[in-house]
């Protein structure tokens, strides 16, 4: 079996494992199948790329386990006309998955190094509907607003008001709510007027959402 055949087999088994974990949206499963997670992990960890585990990345951050990526993506209820804002680019894996389901993905991170690496991966994969920026995630990107969907991939005590304002009426926002280093609630919000109506999805642990742009990395 060649390396490419081995990887295809590994990815097929990976998708089956996600189905067993309750992911039913075929479009989401197809998006995860199309994105080679191995490209987004450290070369020393590639043997774990298709395991359902969170993995460390640069700048002291982590990339979520695939089942959580799938669940959060499924909860957004995307269609091919949506514009999505992702807060917390990280490795770029989540944005790459979103790119196969939405018209436009805007992703941002406070770490220049992470954004640069993610942009390179997007280019390698030929993803032309993803735009990555360095910036303060608590403030979003008002110049590109409004957004149909917003995904926050870092824990926050409450959804920053700037992000609420950038979400379209009836739009969906997914975020882990709670204190750092504690169990948080992954919540799905729907914008009703100027407010958000929330429903809990599951318990999670995410790194904290930090204001500002990193000075050194």
UniProtKB/Swiss-Prot annotation:
Catalyses which reaction(s): [protein]-L-isoaspartate + S-adenosyl-L-methionine = [protein]-L-isoaspartate alpha-methyl ester + S-adenosyl-L-homocysteine
InterPro entries for the chain: PCMT, SAM-dependent_MTases_sf
Subcellular location: Cytoplasm
Keywords carried by this UniProt record: Cytoplasm, Methyltransferase, S-adenosyl-L-methionine, Transferase
Classification via SUPFAM superfamilies: S-adenosyl-L-methionine-dependent methyltransferases
GO molecular function: protein-L-isoaspartate (D-aspartate) O-methyltransferase activity
Catalytic residue list: 64
Domain of life, per lineage: Bacteria
Major enzyme class: transferase
Main location: cytoplasm
Cellular component annotations (GO), alphabetically ordered: cytoplasm
EC numbers, comma separated: 2.1.1.77
Any single biological process term in GO: protein modification process
Family classification: Belongs to the methyltransferase superfamily. L-isoaspartyl/D-aspartyl protein methyltransferase family.
Role summary: Catalyzes the methyl esterification of L-isoaspartyl residues in peptides and proteins that result from spontaneous decomposition of normal L-aspartyl and L-asparaginyl residues. It plays a role in the repair and/or degradation of damaged proteins.
PANTHER family: PROTEIN-L-ISOASPARTATE O-METHYLTRANSFERASE, PROTEIN-L-ISOASPARTATE(D-ASPARTATE) O-METHYLTRANSFERASE
Name recorded for this polypeptide: Protein-L-isoaspartate O-methyltransferase
Species this chain originates from: Azorhizobium caulinodans (strain ATCC 43989 / DSM 5975 / JCM 20966 / LMG 6465 / NBRC 14845 / NCIMB 13405 / ORS 571)
Lineage, broadest ranks: Bacteria, Pseudomonadati, Pseudomonadota, Alphaproteobacteria, Hyphomicrobiales
Gene: pcm
């Amino acid at each position: 079996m060649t390396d490419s055949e081995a990887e295809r087999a590994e990815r097929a088994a990976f998708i089956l494992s996600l189905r067993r974990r309750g992911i039913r949206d075929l479009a989401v499963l197809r998006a995860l199948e199309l994105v080679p997670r191995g490209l987004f992990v450290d070369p020393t960890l590639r043997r774990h790329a298709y395991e359902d585990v969170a993995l460390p990345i640069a700048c002291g951050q982590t990339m979520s386990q695939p089942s959580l990526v799938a669940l959060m993506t499924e909860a957004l209820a995307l269609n091919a006309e949506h514009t999505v804002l992702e807060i917390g680019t990280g490795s770029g894996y989540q944005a790459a998955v979103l790119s196969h389901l939405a018209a436009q993905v805007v992703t941002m991170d406070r770490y220049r190094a992470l954004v640069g690496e993610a942009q390179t991966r997007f280019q390698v994969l030929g993803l032309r509907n993803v735009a990555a920026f360095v910036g303060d995630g608590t403030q979003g990107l008002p110049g590109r607003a409004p957004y149909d969907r917003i995904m926050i991939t870092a824990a926050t005590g409450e959804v920053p008001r700037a992000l609420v304002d950038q979400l379209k009426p009836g739009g969906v926002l997914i975020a882990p709510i709670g204190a750092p280093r504690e169990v948080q609630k992954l919540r799905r919000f729907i914008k009703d007027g100027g407010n958000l109506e929330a429903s809990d999805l599951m318990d999670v642990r995410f790194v904290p959402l930090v204001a500002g742009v990193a000075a050194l990395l």
